């Protein structure tokens, strides 16, 4: 699906319709020293079963693509769409 790189939509902080930049959401780095991560690694050591079950078959064919829009006036970022797509392409719109 082709989606424009810039859209005009409502900004809750500016309380008006403004131009927004569109980008694809990317997850941040996982913290290796977080308690859950340390607990998971400790449980995985040695012999025995997996802490979480391995998934044998998958129910979904695609992942949900989340877009993040940034207001060009105030700089506020917010998630925009979570749509199921195989491919997402951000394109410049020629007017």
From Swiss-Prot:
Pfam families: Ribosomal_L44. One of its GO terms (biological process) is translation. GO terms for molecular function: large ribosomal subunit rRNA binding; structural constituent of ribosome; zinc ion binding. Binds 1 zinc ion per subunit. Zn(2+) binds at residues 11, 14, 71, 74. Its cofactor is Zn(2+). Keywords: Metal-binding, Ribonucleoprotein, Ribosomal protein, RNA-binding, rRNA-binding, Zinc, Zinc-finger. One of its GO terms (cellular component) is ribonucleoprotein complex. The keyword Ribonucleoprotein applies. HAMAP family: Ribosomal_L44e. Belongs to the eukaryotic ribosomal protein eL42 family. Binds to the 23S rRNA. Part of the 50S ribosomal subunit. This is Large ribosomal subunit protein eL42. It comes from Aeropyrum pernix (strain ATCC 700893 / DSM 11879 / JCM 9820 / NBRC 100138 / K1).
